[in-house]
């Protein structure tokens, strides 16, 4: 299990990540009110928001997409890429809804592929993207470090190395709405400094 449920009124919303489904369950009877099925496995917990007095659920999947669905019916509102423009990370933390924006944490995939002796380690890094809550349109993105370049070093197997890389964002961002700032914590360095 990767996700935590959200309870609103008498409904428990749960992201069954490996099955690619979101369930709306009645907390008194345990019966399903509706089930949403995505085209891929899901990765995050669910963020709940009452945008324009219409309750929505926001979450990510295993291929880097953000889903926004109607919390009352489970109907899809939109799906859009949560990836940064370099499209090299993956989404592991839960998106955050603040005002009319969805803030998306982007981690790195170099941690997974770094064990391959033929991989040109490492070229990706963490990022944060912001999407419009109503449309899914990309509003802005922030990268935790500059794009990696070849360092002139080679691995023990003769493969070119890149850097800097790393600083993935594995967790959920925190938003200071009063100051209009997003705070994230970053993970490990994945290449030589």
Language model features: what each stretch is:
Residues 70, 123-137:
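Beta-propeller blade signature
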Residues 1-2, 13, 29-38, 73-84, ...:
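Aromatic (tryptophan-biased) beta-strands that constitute blades/sheets of beta-rich domains
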Residues 73, 106, 132-135, 146, ...:
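A generic secondary-structure signal for well-formed alpha-helical elements
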Residues 71, 114-117, 153:
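Short acidic, glycine/serine/threonine-rich loops at helix termini
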Residues 24, 140-142, 183-184:
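Short beta-strand segments at enzyme active-site cores
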Residues 1-21, 39-66, 88-120, 125-128, ...:
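Repeat-blade elements of multi-bladed beta-propeller folds
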């Amino acid at each position: 299990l990767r996700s935590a449920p959200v309870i609103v009124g008498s409904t428990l919303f749960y992201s069954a990540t490996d099955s690619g489904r979101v369930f709306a369950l009645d907390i008194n009877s345990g019966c399903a009110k509706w089930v949403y099925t995505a085209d891929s496995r899901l990765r995050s917990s669910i963020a709940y928001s009452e945008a324009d007095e219409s309750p929505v659920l926001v979450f990510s999947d295993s291929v880097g997409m953000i889903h926004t669905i109607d919390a009352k019916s489970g109907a899809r509102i939109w799906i859009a890429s949560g990836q940064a423009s370099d499209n090299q990370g993956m989404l592991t933390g839960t998106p955050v809804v603040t005002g009319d924006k969805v803030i998306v944490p982007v981690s790195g995939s170099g941690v997974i592929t770094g064990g391959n002796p033929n991989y040109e380690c490492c070229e990706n890094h963490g990022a944060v993207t912001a999407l419009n809550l109503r449309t899914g349109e990309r509003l802005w993105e922030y990268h935790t470090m500059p794009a990696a370049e070849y360092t002139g070093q080679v691995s023990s197997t003769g493969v070119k190395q890149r850097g800097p890389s790393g600083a993935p964002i594995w967790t959920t961002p925190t938003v200071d709405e009063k100051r209009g700032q997003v705070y994230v914590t970053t993970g490990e360095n994945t290449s030589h400094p």
